C-alpha cells in the first residue's frame, strides 16, 4: 500500500504529478468505453478496475473518523460529479463535441478556487475574477468553433445537444463543491475507496436495468483496452493525487492540474480521432491561462495568510 511517510517532499510531488497525466486521458477513454460496452456496463467495469487499484493503494478509511456531514453530503456530491461527467461524455455526439464537453467540465479548477474563496475563506487577490472571466471566455471560443464567436453560433451549438453541456457543467460544479467540502470536513480521512465502491454500485444497478446498453452487446477490443487503461488511470490519478496532496508541494500540483485539458486534447487526437480546429486550441489556451491566473491570485493569498498566522503565533 502506498504511503507518504517514507517519501520526501520532492518525491511526493513527483508522484502527485502523475494525476494530471492520468486525468488527461479520462475524457477519451470514457468515450471509448461507452462506445465499446454502453454507458452503464462500461463504467461498471471501469470502476471495478479502479476500485481494486485504490483498495491496494489507499485502502479503506476508518468510518469512525469521518465527519458525518462529509459522509452524508460530501461523498454523495463526488458520486454525482462522476455520474454527471460520464453521462455528459456518453451523450455527446462526436469526437470534437466530446472534447468540447470535456472542456466545459475542465472549468472545475477555476470553480474550485472560487468556492475556496467564498466558503473556505482562502485569501486572494483582485485578478482572481479576470482569471475566471478568461477561463469562461475560453469555453465560449471552443463552442463557437473556427469561425469566431457569435451569439447565433453559440446558441446553435448549445441547442444541438444541451443536455451534454449541462451535465458537464454539473460535473464541474459538484466536483468543486466536493473539493470545498473536503477542505472543510475531510480532515485526514481519504474516502476515495468509498466513492469508487458507490460509483461501481450505481453503474452496476443502471446496467441491470438496461440503461445505456445499446451501442455494443458484448464489448469490443477497443472498449476492453479502454476499460483496462481507464480503470488504471482513474485509480492511479486518485492515489497519486492523494499522496501528493498529503506530503508534496501543493502549489506545484495545483498549477499542473490546469494543464490537464491540453493533455486531454493531445491524447484525443489519436484515441478517438478528434478533429480539433484552431478555434478549439485558442479556447484551450484561454482556459489554461485563466485557470493559472486564478491559481496565482489564490496562491499569493494563501502565502499571505500563512505569514499572518505565523506572526500571530509569535505574538502569543
Predicted regions and their residues:
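Specific alpha-helical transmembrane segments that line the substrate/conduction pathway
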Residues: 41-51, 87-121, 250-269
Amino acid at each position: 500500500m502506498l504511503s507518504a511517510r517514507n517519501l520526501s517532499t520532492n518525491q511526493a510531488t513527483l508522484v502527485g504529478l502523475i494525476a494530471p497525466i492520468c486525468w488527461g486521458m479520462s475524457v477519451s477513454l470514457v468515450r471509448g468505453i461507452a462506445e465499446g460496452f454502453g454507458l452503464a456496463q462500461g463504467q461498471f467495469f471501469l470502476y471495478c478496475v479502479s476500485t481494486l487499484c485504490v483498495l491496494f493503494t489507499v485502502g479503506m478509511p476508518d468510518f469512525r473518523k469521518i465527519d458525518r456531514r462529509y459522509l452524508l453530503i460530501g461523498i454523495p456530491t463526488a458520486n454525482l460529479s462522476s455520474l454527471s461527467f460520464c453521462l455528459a461524455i456518453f451523450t455527446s455526439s462526436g469526437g470534437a463535441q466530446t472534447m468540447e464537453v470535456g472542456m466545459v467540465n475542465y472549468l472545475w479548477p477555476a470553480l474550485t478556487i472560487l468556492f475556496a474563496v467564498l466558503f473556505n475563506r482562502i485569501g486572494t487577490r483582485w485578478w482572481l475574477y479576470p482569471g475566471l472571466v478568461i477561463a469562461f471566455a475560453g469555453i465560449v471560443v471552443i463552442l463557437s468553433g473556427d469561425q469566431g464567436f457569435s451569439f447565433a453560433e453559440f446558441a446553435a451549438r448549445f441547442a444541438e445537444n444541451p443536455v451534454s453541456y449541462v451535465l458537464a457543467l454539473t460535473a464541474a460544479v459538484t466536483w468543486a463543491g466536493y473539493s470545498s467540502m473536503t477542505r472543510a470536513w475531510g480532515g485526514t480521512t481519504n474516502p476515495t475507496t468509498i466513492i469508487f465502491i458507490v460509483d461501481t454500485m450505481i453503474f452496476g444497478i443502471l446496467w441491470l436495468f438496461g440503461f445505456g446498453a445499446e451501442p455494443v452487446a458484448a464489448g469490443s477490443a477497443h472498449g476492453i483496452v479502454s476499460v483496462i487503461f481507464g480503470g488504471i488511470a482513474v485509480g492511479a490519478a486518485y492515489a497519486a493525487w492523494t499522496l501528493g496532496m498529503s506530503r508534496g508541494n501543493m502549489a506545484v500540483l495545483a498549477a499542473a492540474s490546469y494543464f490537464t485539458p491540453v493533455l486531454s486534447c493531445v491524447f484525443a487526437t489519436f484515441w478517438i480521432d478528434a478533429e480539433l480546429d484552431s478555434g478549439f486550441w485558442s479556447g484551450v489556451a484561454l482556459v489554461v491561462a485563466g485557470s493559472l491566473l486564478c491559481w496565482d491570485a489564490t496562491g499569493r493569498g494563501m502565502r499571505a495568510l500563512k505569514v499572518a498566522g505565523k506572526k500571530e503565533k509569535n505574538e502569543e
